[in-house]
Regions:
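Patatin-like phospholipase
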Residues: 1-50, 55-230
Length: 230
């Protein structure tokens, strides 16, 4: 009696490491694809990405070959080019929102101090002003904008549910510290580009990304590689 052999599930998990780490991952995949006959990174079953690895995983899951990504990231000879300067744009909206909160925070602190000046130290009363400090210096919304354009053509999709392969983008819930795998059931209804933006929102450098009613930051805060998600 003939027997059939069930093919094992193959997954690709990509870690963080900033722009340099992402370029390294793309270069390694492009080199392996060229050296090993039959190796096609676009035909894996599962893709998991975190931080800069989220950008690469989302692109490869959308059938962008490592060689094409290399040209986009390094050689600048494609229509869509990743410009690192887009990550260095000031978070002006964040600055403005925080500046608007200063008067309210100041008068609240002053009122609190004057209500009990004998027992409340001045520094304790005014510590609430720390909420006016911006949560990020730069704006990483360019990631969302670039990926939206990239995934809107060539048969690609910005919807987890429309991909041919499973994709998980890991980000960290700012309030609970929980690692959330976007793309899993219950977390697959947001755009892939927004999930990648959230996964790469390094605290202090970029503001948290609001998804629904929750704020998310860099998925590498808990661990840099989330292969177990697969």
């Amino acid at each position: 009696m003939a027997t059939t052999t069930r093919r094992s599930t193959i997954g690709l998990a990509l870690a963080g490491g900033g722009p340099v780490g992402g370029i390294y991952e793309v270069g390694a995949m492009a080199a392996l694809a060229e050296a090993l006959d039959g190796l096609d990174f676009n035909e894996f079953d599962i893709y998991v990405g975190v931080s800069s690895g989220a950008f690469i995983a989302a692109a490869v899951a959308n059938r962008l070959a490592p060689s094409s990504l290399a040209r986009m990231l390094v050689e600048d000879d494609t229509e869509e080019v990743f410009d690192p300067e887009m990550l260095l744009r000031p978070a002006l909206g964040e600055y403005f929102r925080r500046a608007l909160s200063v008067p309210v925070l100041f008068w609240t602190a002053l009122r609190q101090y004057l209500s009990d000046p004998w027992h409340l130290r001045l520094i304790e009363a005014f510590q609430g002003l720390s909420h006016a400090i911006p949560t990020g210096v730069f704006n990483n919304a360019g990631i969302d904008q670039l990926l939206r354009r990239l995934f809107s053509s060539g048969g690609r999709s910005n919807d987890f549910r429309q991909l041919d392969h499973r994709l998980f983008i890991v980000a960290t819930d700012l309030d609970t510290g929980e690692s959330i795998p976007f793309g899993a059931p219950g977390y697959d209804d947001i755009p892939i580009s927004v999930a990648v933006q959230a996964s790469a929102a390094l605290p202090g450098l970029f503001p948290p990304v609001l998804v629904g009613e929750r704020y998310f930051v860099d998925g590498a805060l808990i661990k840099t590689l989330h292969a177990s998600v697969a």
